[in-house]
Design a protein with these regions (language model features):
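Solvent-exposed, acidic/flexible segments
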Residues: 2-6, 24-27, 84-92, 101, ...
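Short, solvent-exposed loop/beta-turn-alpha elements that line the ligand-binding surface or hinge
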Residues: 35-44, 65-97, 101, 130-165
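Bilobed "Venus flytrap"/periplasmic-binding protein-like clamshell domains
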Residues: 1-11, 124
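Generic hydrophobic alpha-helical scaffold/packing signal
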Residues: 10, 14, 31, 96, ...
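Hydrophobic aliphatic residue packing
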Residues: 9, 16-18, 137
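Periplasmic binding protein-like
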Residues: 14-75, 111-112
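Residue-level detector of functional hotspots within protein domains
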Residues: 4, 8, 78, 113-115, ...
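Bilobed periplasmic-binding protein-like "clamshell/Venus-flytrap" ligand-binding domains
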Residues: 41-52, 100-140
Length: 165
């Protein structure tokens, strides 16, 4: 599926005059994290990459916190760190610290949106393009199930019940 998306994007870019070279790397190498390999996602020696990361749950903090300056992989930390876009903004780092101290859900959501905008529309460090959908199902005799794209399938298991037939 990933290669199909890449081919489509390459075609779109070609239509507007942008040349693109696709490089296919075995997933075990790309996601392997071998500090000696030039082809890991931590190093990523290219101008743009496609990845399918998203956070699970209603709490954006763990996902956003991956983008602080100190999480940028590089030779000084043996290519460890989750900030593979290497986005670095001290204001964003300060927001991560601030977010960890906020309890009110509405205030957390507001700051989370601000931080998301910093990563996306304000800096283009991350450009959301496609959400790869997931397939979920449940028995017709099970009520109260509320599936969503942002949490595990059993996030509201306490609300489930058997439907009387």
């Amino acid at each position: 599926m990933r290669q199909d998306f890449q081919a489509l994007i390459k075609q779109w870019w070609q239509e507007i005059g942008v040349e693109t070279e696709l490089k296919v790397i075995d997933a075990s190498v790309y996601f392997g994290g071998d500090a000696g390999s030039p082809d890991t996602f931590q190093k990523f020696y290219a101008d743009i990459e496609m990845y399918a990361n998203f956070f699970e749950g209603a709490n954006p903090e763990p996902s956003l916190a991956k983008n602080i300056c100190s999480q940028s992989p590089g030779p000084d930390n043996q290519w460890q760190g989750e900030n593979t876009s290497r986005y670095c903004d001290p204001a964003f780092d300060a927001h991560v610290k601030e977010l960890s101290g906020i309890i009110d859900p509405a205030k957390r959501a507001e700051l989370g949106r601000t931080m998301n905008d910093m990563l996306t529309k304000d800096s283009n460090a991350i450009i959301p393009l496609v959400y790869r959908g997931t397939a979920s199902a449940h028995a017709n005799t099970l009520g109260g199930v509320a599936l969503n794209a942002w949490d595990t399938e059993i996030w509201n298991v306490a609300d489930w019940f058997r439907v009387k037939q």
